[in-house]
Structure formats: structure tokens, C-alpha cells
Amino acid sequence: MKAAVVTKDHHVDVTYKTLRSLKHGEALLKMECCGVCHTDLHVKNGDFGDKTGVILGHEGIGVVAEVGPGVTSLKPGDRASVAWFYEGCGHCEYCNSGNETLCRSVKNAGYSVDGGMAEECIVVADYAVKVPDGLDSAAASSITCAGVTTYKAVKLSKIRPGQWIAIYGLGGLGNLALQYAKNVFNAKVIAIDVNDEQLKLATEMGADLAINSHTEDAAKIVQEKTGGAHAAVVTAVAKAAFNSAVDAVRAGGRVVAVGLPPESMSLDIPRLVLDGIEVVGSLVGTRQDLTEAFQFAAEGKVVPKVALRPLADINTIFTEMEEGKIRGRMVIDFRH
């Protein structure tokens, strides 16, 4: 099979590999689509350690071709996911308390185990989430990572219908966060970005207020127009966005951190204490979160913006990512 494999010189080779036989509890997927994520770029570049030889991809959707012994959750013909959360230990405090993505023995697709950017992929059947009918595989691939990440973040913000939520960063992640906040949680959305083009799209997608934080004081405007957001989700990777989010929420507000800026965040501790503001981190989502995120997309409440590309384009896509030319989600199409 053809696969996108990381090389020692931080490149990706599209090469031929042979998969091993299935073990107990595993399933073989014939891949249809696999999204390309910034995390793939980090893995390729060795930012998280040398991953030479690994097959990239954690936004994969495939059709079950074969199941191994003991598999009851999947059957041939089902569509299922290859997600970042590939497998947990299944018995630690995190796995047993609904926080399985925090498992200290977690395996991650396209990082610690081979991922879905190949014509075929082996998954642990109980950890592969089924894709509902009516949801296209290309759209589902984006929900597998960006979608479930933002859905979980908005869920964790504890936002309620009619309340104000500020979304910082309206790129691939932020656009989906906006849709989940608006169309699933029925919140009023404040879109905050430094790019007017992204803000225009956000307004078209239903944002109630759009602010360019490069030219305006976003926190000040949010406080003046709404009395302070009830919550904020930060997908941007700039330290300034995190600091602004803390200033933009009202007393009792919650800031959910999703983006990973290289710098440390500055926190006004007295304000956090006196105004009861919470700052929490959110990492992807559980299998249940992904099931829910898929269903809302299948119902048409969330529509990822995707562009289909051939596997041969993978290095070009990474170059475009590094140059900031990507709009929406790039998806490798294995169906043609």
C-alpha cells in the first residue's frame, strides 16, 4: 500500500509499505480520506521528537475491510475513524472517569503508532468511532480532529443558550468552534481575529460580533458591548490572544485554551481570584465526544470547509501550511 512516511531529514516520502496481520481486537480499514493537520507538520519536523518511519495521519476515515478475533464493535462495510486518540490503557483513573484522552499510556495515531495517511490502516476496533450515514467522509475527516477538538472546548466552556462566547482565532479550528457554539449550543458568538478575511467569513457563518484585534482592543469592546463574555475559547497561537481572553470574560467566566503558543501566558492572579475566572486547557475529545461531534455534522449543523488533494501533494501541502496559505482543511482523498 502507499503511505506518507516521515523521513529523517524532516521530509515525507510517499512509499510502499506492507501491513502486518491483524491481532485480537483490531480491524483493517480501507482508507477513504485523511485530513492534514498542523500536528502532522510538527511530527514531520521532529518538533515532538524523532518520528522517522512513522505513517502520518490522525484525521482518517476508512471502510472496514476485515476484523480480527474478538471484534464486536465493527463489521466489514462500516465507516470508522482513525483519530489522534488511538488507544488508552482502559483501566487508569482517566480512562475510568470519562477523561480517557489524559491517559498517561495513551497511543496517538500518526505519532506513537502508524496513522491513517495511507491506503490502509490498522485500528483498535473499540477505539475507532463509527461515522453516521449522511456524513461525507471528507467532512468527517475534519471532524475527527479539528471538529471534536473545538466541540469539546465549547462543551468545556459550559456556555448556555443565549450567552456570549468569544472565539479567538477563526482559522480551521475557530471556524468549527463558531459553528458548534452557534448551531449546537445556541450561544451568541464574538469572532476575534487579526485577519479581516477570516472575520468576514465568520460573520457569514453567523457570528454576532466580529472584532479585528490587530486594530482594536478586543477585550475592551467585548466588555463594553456585552458586559463581558460568559466564556472564551482560544484557538489562536498568539500569547496576546490568551491574555485578551482573560480580560474579555465577565466575573465567573471561563477561558478554554486550545491553541499552543510557544510563549508562557501572563495571568492577572488578583483578577482571577477576585472575579472567580477559570482558565482550563482542552485536549481533543473522547470517543463519546467524537460520536456527538459526528452526529451534529451529519445533521448539517456543522459544515467543515475542505479541499481534496492527492497523496502526492503532501509535501506541497506542508509548504503551504508553513507559508500560511491554507484556507479550510486539506484532505487527502484515497477514493480516486
Curated annotation (Swiss-Prot):
Enzyme Commission code: 1.1.1.1
Signal peptide residues on this chain, from the entry's feature table: none
Record SMART domains: PKS_ER
Keywords: Metal-binding, NAD, Oxidoreductase, Zinc
Top-level class of the enzyme under EC nomenclature: oxidoreductase
Recorded GO MF terms: alcohol dehydrogenase (NAD+) activity; zinc ion binding
Coiled coil: none
Annotated catalysed reactions: a primary alcohol + NAD(+) = an aldehyde + NADH + H(+); a secondary alcohol + NAD(+) = a ketone + NADH + H(+)
Amino-acid positions noted as binding Zn(2+) 1 in the UniProt annotation, renumbered to this chain: 37, 58, 145
InterPro entries attached to this UniProt entry: ADH-like_C, ADH-like_N, ADH_Zn_CS, GroES-like_sf, NAD(P)-bd_dom_sf, PKS_ER
PROSITE patterns named in the record: ADH_ZINC
A matching Pfam family: ADH_zinc_N
SUPFAM superfamilies reported for this sequence: GroES-like, NAD(P)-binding Rossmann-fold domains
GO biological process, one term: DNA damage response
Co-factor remark: Binds 2 Zn(2+) ions per subunit.
Positions with a binding annotation for Zn(2+) 2: 89, 92, 95, 103
Family label: Belongs to the zinc-containing alcohol dehydrogenase family.
PANTHER family registered for this protein in UniProt: ALCOHOL DEHYDROGENASE 1-RELATED, VACUOLAR PROTEIN SORTING-ASSOCIATED PROTEIN 11
Biological function: Preferred specificity is towards 1-propanol.
Name of protein: Alcohol dehydrogenase, propanol-preferring
Organism: Escherichia coli (strain K12)
Taxonomic placement: Bacteria, Pseudomonadati, Pseudomonadota, Gammaproteobacteria, Enterobacterales
Gene name, Swiss-Prot/TrEMBL: adhP
